[in-house]
Amino acid sequence: TTPFIAAGKGFASGLLTSSSTMRPGLVNNADFLPTVMSFFGAGVPSKVTGSTMKTAGKAPGGKTALAYIQDLDRQFHVTRAARWPAVLGYVILVGVFLLLGLACLPYLSRRLRGGRWRNALMRALGPVSVVVVAAPLSFLLVSAFSYNSGVFPVLFCGLYTLAVGLGAYFLARDNERLDPVTLVCVFSASVMVIDLLFGGRLLVFPLLGSSSLEGMRFFGQSNAVTGMMLGYAVWGVAGLAGDGMRGRTGVRWAALAALALVSFTIGFGGLGANFGGFVAAVATSLIFFFATSEAGFKRWRIPAIAAITLGATAMIVLIDDLFVHTHAGRAVAGGAGAAVPMFGRKILILIGQIKSVLFLALLMIALVIALALWMKRPATAWASRWKTDPAFTGALFAVATGSVVALLFNDTGIAMMGTMVLITIPTVTYHFVRGAPGASKDLRLEGSTPPSRD
């Protein structure tokens, strides 16, 4: 962080802010040039990154301006130090969880001679799945607290994850309408939407991020957070729709409307302010809508999805240009001359991020694309699954293909794809183990596909 003091025409006593951050006491280094140009009465071209600084008023909480800024700076460094251990620990946890889930697959369990332990492991993975899917939201909720070391966030995230995950499991495990994973997904997505409506306080110092700085945008959603929100929303909507997706057009339209609302909160400049995330969210919503239709997802629907997504993006950019005036909105609205340099920077950032975790990134991309292609191949187990459980199958296909769109249209798209996958792994595992012998009533709902016996 760099301290900055402004005085003279247009400035009063108090904290500085800009439309780049919309946070009292926080501005970007890129705000310096447009501020100077505005001070001397020169117009600010759309290709200029940053926004004009202005006075935001006194520091909140009765603090002096200096004390408030020092507290922000301290929390920034503490959060940055705590981020990697927390995120890496969770990724390792999901990796171990995934390996245990794969070991329960009939083919692998036979190879591992898992006849004795397979059913017991599947029963255990039921509640563990709910706990794992509840964890990511805690990385945002911890931002509501001030702490001085990495101990508090680890304890908070762990206790929250266990309390919410196990609480949802025991509360909804025998509910024939609302399973525990759906309950967690709906709750988590709702918390994130409500937080955006009230200014995005949880986005200031989130633990979730793909680097020491990514995520600390101070205003709007990072790509990692957007992927998490989209994953929660898709699986929550799919779980609520359930069997209603079969032959009931009204349920599909209601699901699309819910996902459209989530997409708007992601893209609108006064809320999520993530245009690349908006593109991915709209595309994912449309893929889910078409994939759950009676006709299924056909190739000819791809141009329709592209056209609708383009139209929706143009509309959100127009709304931003009229009412909010974020930098990204100005750049896109300014035409190719202003937008191309911004997209060029995004591509370079994306390539750099993929290179930093090359093997894991390429492996994840390859597996996600392979899954999407496999799900649409005829004469596979998916052919019957599309008919018996369109909500679950359509959601999985939408997340897989939508995460590829997220990868292509965001500078840190690999982070957005990653968080969508992190939400999906425990969700899919829960659906898989729901047929385990001895599982709760909810885990044996009609329409689920029991795993093969050894």
Predicted regions and their residues:
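Soluble extramembrane regions of membrane proteins in the secretory/endomembrane system
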Residues: 1-81
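Core alpha-helical transmembrane segments of integral membrane proteins
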Residues: 70-213, 225-236
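Short aromatic-rich membrane-water interface segments that cap or initiate transmembrane helices
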Residues: 76-87, 210-230, 270, 336-360
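Hydrophobic cores of alpha-helical transmembrane segments in multi-pass inner/ER membrane proteins
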Residues: 92-101, 156-175, 221-242, 280-297, ...
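Membrane-interface helix caps and helix-loop-helix hairpins in membrane proteins
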Residues: 144-151, 266-275, 408-415
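Membrane-interfacial entry segments at the cytosolic side of transmembrane helices
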Residues: 175-183, 247-253, 294-308
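Long, compositionally biased intrinsically disordered regions
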Residues: 230, 254, 299-320, 324-454
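Hydrophobic alpha-helical segments of polytopic membrane proteins
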Residues: 258-261, 276-315, 425-426
